[in-house]
Amino acid sequence: MAIQTVTDAIRYVGVDDNTLALFENQYSVQPMGVSYNSYVILDEKIAVMDSVDARATEEWLSNVARVLEGRRPDYLVVTHMEPDHSGSLMRLAQKYPEMKIVGNAKTFTLIKQFFGTGALSEERMLEVGEGSTLSLGSHRLRFLLVPMVHWPEVMAAYEEEEKILFSADAFGRFGSLERTARAPWAPQARRYYYNIVGKYGAQVQALLKKISALEIKTICPLHGPVLTEGLEECLRFYDLWSQWEPEESESILIAHASIHGNTAHAAKTLKGKLEKKGVQVNICDLTVTDLSYAVASAFYCGKLVLASATYDGELFPPMREFLEHLRTKGFRNRRVGLIEDGSWAPDAARLMRTKLEEMKDIHLYETVVSLRGALNQTSEAQMDALVAELCAE
C-alpha cells in the first residue's frame, strides 16, 4: 500500500496483505484482504506507531525509511503486542539501536516472552502508564490503558495537538485499503468486532467512557481505513455492539446445518413463510459459510432460528461449532427458535437447548419444529405455529 498523508506531520506507513487466506488462521479475508496499519509522527522527535506482521516486514521497513528521509526515529510506540502488529518490532529495533520502545509494563512482559529476555536492554524500554504523556515537540501523546480490548497490554494513544486517537485494534475492519477503499465501514467492522473483540464488551465500554471526554477528529486503527468522517456513527456502533444489542431487533437469522438437504429445505421454507409476513430474514448455510459471517449476522439480528440435523446422536458439527463461537463471543439477550431433524431419533433440539443454556438471557420459543427426514403435515403445522410466535412480538 502506498504511503498516505494523515496530516502534515503524520503519515500512514502500513501494508496491505491481499494474499492471506485466514485471519488468525480461522476467519476468511478473501477476497477483501487485510491491512496492517502503522503510522509515523514527524516532529522534533519522531515516533513510529506500531509495527506490522512479519509477512510484511520488508515493505513496512521501506515505507518507514521513505518517510524518514534520512532521519532516525526516536520512539517505537507499541499499543498492541499481537504478532500481526509486533511481528516486525525487533527488525526496526535492530535497524535503529538508539530508538526507544514505548509501552506499558505488560507490553514489556510480552516482548520478553516473544523475543527473549535479552531482546531489549532496560535502557531502551520507556514504560508509560495511564495518563502518561510523551512530548515529540509540537505533538504530544497521552496514553490510555485499555486492557482486554482485546489483549491485556493494549493501550490507546491520543495525540493532543491534532486530536487523533491511535486506537489499537478498536475501530478496526477487515479489508485491505487498496481493495476496500470505497466500501462502507460498518459491514466488515461489525464482522471484525464480533469475532475478534466481541467477548470483551465491558472493556470496550470502559474504552468508550475514557475517550468520551476527548475531542477526536481522526481515529487511526491498526486495521482498516483511517477514520475522519462519520466518527459519531462509528462510536454509536461500538456502543451498541459492546452491549450485545441487536441492530435490527425484528430481523431474523435462520442458521441451518443440513447433511443431505432436508434440514436446509425446512429452513428455506420457514424463510418464505416469514417473508410473506413482511419479516426481514437472513439465512445462513453453516456447512459452507465462513463462521465469522454467521456470527456477525446472529448479533445483528434480534431473533435467531437454529435448524440442525442430528448426527451420530449428537449435533451436526457445523451447528455445534457455530454455537460454540456464539458462546465464546458473549451471545445473549436474544429470542431463539429451534428446528431439529433426524431420520430415526431427532435429538438436535435438546442438544441445541443445552448449548444455549450456557449463554445469558436466551429465551426459547415454545414451538419446536421436529422433522423425521422431511417436512410433513405435522411438522408444517409446527412451523406455522413457530411463525406465529416469531411474528407475535
Regions found by a protein language model. Name each.
Residues I3-R66, A156-E159, K163-S167, T263:
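Conserved beta-strand hairpin/beta-sheet module of binuclear metal-dependent hydrolase folds
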Residues Q4-D8, V102-V154, Y200-L208:
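Metallo-beta-lactamase
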Residues V40, A156-Y192, V197-C220, E229-H256:
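Metal-dependent phosphodiesterase/nuclease catalytic metal-binding core
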Residues E44, R55-V102:
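Active-site metal-binding motif and surrounding structural segment of the metallo-beta-lactamase
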Residues M49-S51, P73-M81, K100-N104, L165-A168, ...:
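Active-site neighborhood of phospho(di)ester-bond hydrolases with catalytic His/Asp-centered motifs
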Residues S88, D290-A294:
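Short acidic active-site motifs
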Residues L177-I219, H223-V226, T269-C284, A294-E393:
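FMN-binding flavodoxin-like domain, especially the glycine-rich phosphate-binding loop
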